[in-house]
Amino acid sequence: HSDVVPIETIMTVVARHFALMTEAGFENMTPSCITSFGIYTEILHTWETHPEWEEKTREFLWKATKREFQKPKNLAHTSDVIYKFRNEIAAQKKYSLVDIHTGRPLQVVDHIGCHYAKMFPSKGIGGAEFPAVLSGMVSAWGGQPVDYPERRHCCGFGFRNYLVLANRGFSVANSKKKFESMQPYEPDFIITNCPGC
């Protein structure tokens, strides 16, 4: 988003989030927003490779808020945390992802938010091409993940795509393409790990 908001501003906003985390006594961060996860990952990487940017950000944050921060010891998307405990959750579940009338596993299509693993494939479970975070949960809980041709296609949401009126046609066209790709498989439901999607 640095073409719309200066990168220094984005870094300072992220630093404020880290400061709030630090002030609350937490060491780990688990954002549910895919875009935030991608931005936090990118900024931590930038600070690692360009420490002068981190120092500049610390100065901006202090000047604006009189706050300081520690970087998170661990950064994981919320879906990664749930995935990590999927088997423990399965052992305690009351219901499985199974049709109660037929015993057939529910057919589930997933949509992985673009900023989950496309920017940094090593940070997402299964990487960018074959993300397994949601399908792994579905399998562990008795459902049947369904692969479909446009599984990795963007849903079209994107802040610039949906929030800017002139771009909404692009957003709707992407969603339509995605839904049409799912339709022949007659899924019982769709899951996603992105609140925007």
Residue ranges and their predicted role:
Residues 1-197:
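Iron-sulfur cluster-binding electron-transfer modules in prokaryotic oxidoreductases
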